């Protein structure tokens, strides 16, 4: 697979953030740098860029809950609403001890770009609670969720801000949130959140969607580079919802999956893995290596000589320390932010194509959009329809990004951000600034 040479750098030219600092960028620094960089390719009003540097609103709340032992503990929660020029805010809610205001702002900006590159009628938001969910009993987690919902009830809603699951939350969390909101509204309002169980208004195919979109984009980019899928080797870091679903679909479509991994290490089989026979993290946590004849480290997986590398676990796993050793021709980002900015530049210099997360794993927010449509219309879709509609949306987004990639001679990441920012800027131009 031969990659075309493109832009040799994805660094921000504004100088506001040190893209090659020894310290990892914060989510907010990264989002702003990507904004400046995309804007440098476009003839847009710099006043719009200035507005997009900041969230429209950030809500900070205190959440007192009674623990199972009768004591009361107070947690801090956030909901950062970045931009709603194209529609209601949309983004996840995470429960993690490291949740901060700035993290929510930065991730909310990323959601703005992701929704725009997919041409969804949403803006970006992100929220969460600074708590370790592993230290909560199910009853405590429910009380936390319901109280958090009450604290942010006035700033969320089907036409205002629609949360979804994220790190430390799941469909059950969303069901509690929907119920707490509905009880206060006096009517069942399933469209207030997405990622719910189907029995209470969730969509078929929602949990599998990010992995499915990664597989679809991998197939499309292989076609673009004249790489037959049945002659393509793939390594997948992470075997959770994203990695497992992507690996199994690509396996089904004819690719050879030579490595998969979890936190304990990687299973390596040069002749190909029967992905259906290896349980995902959801099916049997941290079990990948117990099914392996040959075990390698996660670090070794990243540098395997394969056609396609799919980092689908953690952020910042491809760094300046290992970017020169990446042997894959193509990197498809299944995780959020798996490639640091410095590594991105190194890979671009080496003509390694990197398909960015805001395109590749956008299946999650896209099927969340489908779920929202089903909720407000009170009509459920079949799994077949969900998957067909997702494929159509991914192909449309791919075509838009591909056109910018070819016309502007930029990297795939730059092309995706150019598509997103041009759509957002056009909406701001049309709506204007009031008063």
Curated annotation (Swiss-Prot):
Tell me a Gene Ontology molecular-function term this record carries: glutamate dehydrogenase (NAD+) activity
How is this chain modified after translation? The N-terminus is blocked.
Biased composition range(s): Acidic residues: 14-23
Q: What is its EC number?
A: 1.4.1.2
Location of the region described as Disordered in the Swiss-Prot/TrEMBL record: 1-28
Please write the reaction equations for the catalytic activity of this protein: L-glutamate + NAD(+) + H2O = 2-oxoglutarate + NH4(+) + NADH + H(+)
The Gene Ontology biological process annotation of the record reads: glutamate catabolic process
Active-site residues from the entry: 126
Report the domain of life of the source organism. Answer: Archaea
Q: How does activity depend on temperature?
A: Optimum temperature is 70 degrees Celsius. The enzyme is entirely stable from 50 to 70 degrees Celsius and 55 % activity is retained after 30 minutes at 90 degrees Celsius.
- Asked whether the keyword Oxidoreductase is assigned, the reply is yes
Please provide the record's keywords in A-Z order: NAD, Oxidoreductase
Activity regulation (record text) = Inhibited by ethanol, acetone, acetonitrile and 2-propanol (65 to 70% inhibition) and to a lesser extent by methanol and dimethyl formamide (26 and 49 % inhibition respectively). No effect of glycerol or DMSO.
InterPro entries found in the cross-reference section = Aminoacid_DH-like_N_sf, Glu/Leu/Phe/Val/Trp_DH, Glu/Leu/Phe/Val/Trp_DH_C, Glu/Leu/Phe/Val/Trp_DH_dimer, Glu/Leu/Phe/Val_DH_AS, Glu_DH, GluDhGdhB, NAD(P)-bd_dom_sf
Task: Describe the pH dependence.
Answer: Optimum pH for oxidative deamination is 9.2. Optimum pH for reductive amination is 8.5.
Q: Which SMART domains match?
A: ELFV_dehydrog
> Which Pfam families does the record match to this protein?
ELFV_dehydrog, ELFV_dehydrog_N
Q: What does the miscellaneous comment read? A: Strain NRC-36014 contains 4 distinct glutamate dehydrogenases while strain NRC-1 contains only 3. GdhX is only present in strain NRC-36014.
Q: What family does the Swiss-Prot or TrEMBL record give for this protein?
A: Belongs to the Glu/Leu/Phe/Val dehydrogenases family.
Q: How does it assemble?
A: Homohexamer.
Put simply, this protein is called: NAD-specific glutamate dehydrogenase A
Which source organism? Halobacterium salinarum
Protein encoded by which gene:
gdhX
